[in-house]
């Protein structure tokens, strides 16, 4: 899980989800998991 100021989808399988006002990126590739600070 990377915590970043700006999150962007890295590949086609990355999904952007807003949970409790926090942007998250979920992907099959675990290296692509991100969360907005």
From Swiss-Prot:
Point out the coiled-coil segments of this chain.
none
Task: Quote the protein name from its UniProt record.
Answer: Large ribosomal subunit protein bL36
Q: What family does this chain come from, according to its entry? A: Belongs to the bacterial ribosomal protein bL36 family.
User: Per the record's keyword annotation, is Ribosomal protein included, yes or no?
Assistant: yes
> Which Gene Ontology terms cover its molecular function?
structural constituent of ribosome
Q: Which GO terms describe its biological process?
A: translation
Per its UniProt entry, which superkingdom is the organism in?
Bacteria
Keywords of the record, alphabetical order, are: Ribonucleoprotein, Ribosomal protein
Q: Name one Pfam family in it.
A: Ribosomal_L36
Xref: InterPro entries: Ribosomal_bL36 (IPR000473), Ribosomal_bL36_sp (IPR035977)
Tell me the organism's taxonomic lineage.
Bacteria, Pseudomonadati, Spirochaetota, Spirochaetia, Spirochaetales
Record's GO cellular component terms: cytoplasm; ribonucleoprotein complex; ribosome
List the HAMAP family: Ribosomal_bL36
């Amino acid at each position: 899980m990377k915590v970043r100021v700006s999150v962007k989808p890295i590949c086609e399988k990355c999904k952007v989800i807003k949970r409790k006002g926090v942007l998250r990126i979920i992907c099959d590739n675990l290296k692509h998991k991100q969360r907005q600070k």
